[in-house]
Amino acid sequence: MVHVDNEHGVPHYWGKTGKGLQRLITIVATTDFLLFGYDQGVMSGIISAPAFTDDFPQVLDETYEGFVVSIYAVGCFLGALFILNFGDRLGRRKSIFLGAIVMIIGVIIQIAAVPPSGGATAQFIIGRCITGIGNGINTSTIPTYQAECSESHNRGKLICIEGGNVAIGTLIAYWIDYGCTYGPAPFVWRFPIAFQVVFASIVLVMMMKLPESPRWLLTHGRRQEAMTILAGLNGQPRDSADVTTQMATIEKAIAAAGHKGGKTPFSALFTGGKTQHFRRLILGASSQMMQQLSGCNAVIYYFPILFQKSIGTDHNLALLLGGVNMIIYSIFATTSWFAVERIGRRKLFLIGTVGQCLSMVLSFGALIPGTASASKGAAVGLFTYIAFFGATWLPLPWLYPAEINPLKTRAKANATSTVSNWLWNFFIVMITPVMIHGTGTNGWGTYAFFAAMNAIFFPIIYFFYPETSGRSLEEIDLIFAKGYTEKMSYVTAAKQLPRMEDHEVHEKAREYGFGSDDDIKVSHSESERENGVMTDSAV
């Protein structure tokens, strides 16, 4: 990484320090999640395009169609597994750099396919899988990197902004797909696929001169480098009081968590007791599972096909309506930026679940008569579904695992949650075409299935998911200690535990039997909370 000190001895990266440097890191994070969203949406307009099916006729088979789309999720799953095993060893910066390179290689392989040769389809599938590996690497790393380089008070908002950019990326993909339908046949699918390189290249170039996570450096004993980066993130000289204090805070947190060489054993994920590592792992990973089983990617990946097969529109109109739907998706995704702290995570989960369930009920109910006029109601249901999803379930499963898991297991638990996301993503994307074509219900059986899934999720969220809004990460640890020690529901424990200042958290931790070097970190000062960098979000 390249930095230059100014005349005051403050390190600069890309000519920026302090807030400016944090903005550059945010730009990288949002660009990568734009790419994430673009990848999710790009195949939706291509997979049923005549120009694509002429070049790759195998996708006319529903099972093969599902495989071509879902193989991307397999790649993402493999990328997340890679980070689960090697992320702490490689570091945040190198992981992101590697992910961007892998994605570019995958794109090149896809657009270099030359139909109608026998191996063209296989080459396209391999390239799509490799692109997914790169995306899996980055989506498992970027949220952690941004959190570790950001201020604690805007942790939730920043991760929700990342989620909002998934919707915006999908919007861009839909409209590029639609515009390319008016070009020559090879352009219809080659250009939308190739456009992914733009986002990946921005990430790649910017990461060349952006810093590593100071928290990761400290877990690996690279103290001087970490101090330089903290100084740059603060916009202060290395020997300033704030930088020195933050260094001490991070080092104490790492020691308290039992990090040795930056490694946490997998066995730590499965412990209970006052820390409830396993329960918290399940809460985070199951939120990703429920996001996928709610039907989101059945709608995002296959919106044009849903319209063509279930409602009877032609391909161009289906693409146009898909683009309009993605505008709605993007608009409502931005509402989470402002609602996540005011309304809370738990209430947003519940509101989204009810809205998504009713939207799917509307869609399958409107398709039962099998008439063109009634099927228009199904379109309304898909529009309302994506609005509720964008405002609630899109960002929350990325935020909740980052908050709910404790310092000691957070990196591995977050990677496990991402693995869960891509595993269930593959399952849903694979079975959706078969469900649409093979249920013999004019498509309404597909929507009935997702309505039932959302109905099941409501009591799970209501009874098992505690609220984390407005809590420091230390207070969230105390919620689980209170629930375990006092034998009560963790949802109730979250409601009963009062808001605390740092010294109160310390006293309560002692009451529950946590020592200064146990699993909980309780030694932040008020000035550290105000300064923000590398306090709550440092772990």
PLM region spans:
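Alpha-helical transmembrane bundle of multi-pass membrane proteins
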Residues: 1-234, 248, 254-539
